[in-house]
Amino acid sequence: GQPKAAPSVTLFPPSSEELQANKATLVCLISDFYPGAVTVAWKADSSPVKAGVETTTPSKQSNNKYAASSYLSLTPEQWKSHKSYSCQVTHEGSTVEKTVAPTECS
């Protein structure tokens, strides 16, 4: 079979355009992992976030590895009221965590 591949994780903060439209969505991209099963957990500061999370089913990429994404929908108030948000991806027993922090400037 294929060798296991750890996912690469990229976390995108809400865009300024989106915040101006009074929305805030964090996007966690998970790519190049094998086998195609991951667990995604979101954290605000260090407390778990359950509401507003949507994670896609992993799909096979052209290189036969898998990719998935997870979305966290927030209000701008929620986004600004925490020091940081983290996307925690667990794959085959190992965990990758990426963190974004809201900037002060609007």
Swiss-Prot record:
GO terms for molecular function: antigen binding. Disulfide bonds join C28-C87. Keywords: Adaptive immunity, Bence-Jones protein, Cell membrane, Disulfide bond, Immunity, Immunoglobulin, Immunoglobulin domain, Membrane, Secreted. It comes from the Eukaryota. InterPro entries: Ig-like_dom, Ig-like_dom_sf, Ig-like_fold, Ig/MHC_CS, Ig_C1-set, MHC/Immunoglobulin. Residues 7-101 form the Ig-like domain. SMART domains: IGc1. GO terms for cellular component: blood microparticle; extracellular exosome; extracellular region; extracellular space; IgA immunoglobulin complex; IgD immunoglobulin complex; IgE immunoglobulin complex; IgG immunoglobulin complex. It is found in: Secreted; Cell membrane. Alleles IGLC3*01, IGLC3*02, and IGLC3*03 display the following serological isotype: Mcg-, Kern- and Oz+. The Mcg-isotype marker is characterized by Ala-6, Ser-8 and Thr-57; the Ke- marker by Ser-46 and the Oz+ marker by Lys-83. Allele IGLC3*04 displays the following serological isotype: Mcg-, Kern- and Oz-. Constant region of immunoglobulin light chains. Immunoglobulins, also known as antibodies, are membrane-bound or secreted glycoproteins produced by B lymphocytes. In the recognition phase of humoral immunity, the membrane-bound immunoglobulins serve as receptors which, upon binding of a specific antigen, trigger the clonal expansion and differentiation of B lymphocytes into immunoglobulins-secreting plasma cells. Secreted immunoglobulins mediate the effector phase of humoral immunity, which results in the elimination of bound antigens. Immunoglobulins are composed of two identical heavy chains and two identical light chains; disulfide-linked. This is Immunoglobulin lambda constant 3. The lineage of its organism: Eukaryota, Metazoa, Chordata, Craniata, Vertebrata.
